[in-house]
Amino acid sequence: MSKKNTDISKFLSYILRHQPEAIGLSLDKEGWVVISDLILCAAEEGYIFDNNLIHSIVNNSDKKRFTISDDGLRIRAAQGHSTQQVDIRYEAKIPPEFLYHGTATRFIISIRVQGLNAKDRQYVHLSADEETAIQVGSRHGKPIVLRIKALTMYEQGFYFYQAANGVWLSNSIPYQFIQE
């Protein structure tokens, strides 16, 4: 992805996940916004892009952070919201036996005490494979991958969800279900 497209993708993540009001947007409860409204509000803040570029970024992103509606008129972040405007209703799913969480080693002491909590997001994000978890953890420093006993959690009454981009979500992960 070109630097311009990467910059726009980061801008879209910021707006669609965290601060839509920063450019005067409101998201609906499911996180959707009309693409033409997004383009106009972004232009007023100096971010210039068009419908074709948005579709290109969404379609060519390996992380699949965004979803475009079936009619092609709206966009939303697939998951990762901290804004309270959004409450996507994911359908609960039975997880695989293990899921993975990538983090930085400097957070491990806190995790041992508190488990994994969503903090300023709505869910804890989990990966289906270790490689993805390593990439996620590397963004925050020296990575460590935690193996989550997801199926055991599910059998004990915890819920798991899966976003459209394949990221697994849970409200929290108590430490007794985490393997270092």
Swiss-Prot record:
GO biological process, one term: tRNA splicing, via endonucleolytic cleavage and ligation
Keywords: NAD, Transferase
EC number(s) given by UniProt: 2.7.1.-
GO MF assignments: NAD+ poly-ADP-ribosyltransferase activity; tRNA 2'-phosphotransferase activity
Enzyme class: transferase
Superkingdom of origin: Bacteria
SUPFAM superfamilies (alphabetical): ADP-ribosylation
Protein's UniProt keywords contain Transferase: yes
Keyword Transferase: yes
Any Pfam family matching the protein: PTS_2-RNA
InterPro entries assigned: Ptrans_KptA/Tpt1, RNA_2'-PTrans_C, RNA_2'-PTrans_KptA, RNA_2'-PTrans_N
Function: Removes the 2'-phosphate from RNA via an intermediate in which the phosphate is ADP-ribosylated by NAD followed by a presumed transesterification to release the RNA and generate ADP-ribose 1''-2''-cyclic phosphate (APPR>P). May function as an ADP-ribosylase.
Family: Belongs to the KptA/TPT1 family.
Descriptive protein name: Probable RNA 2'-phosphotransferase
Species: Pectobacterium atrosepticum (strain SCRI 1043 / ATCC BAA-672)
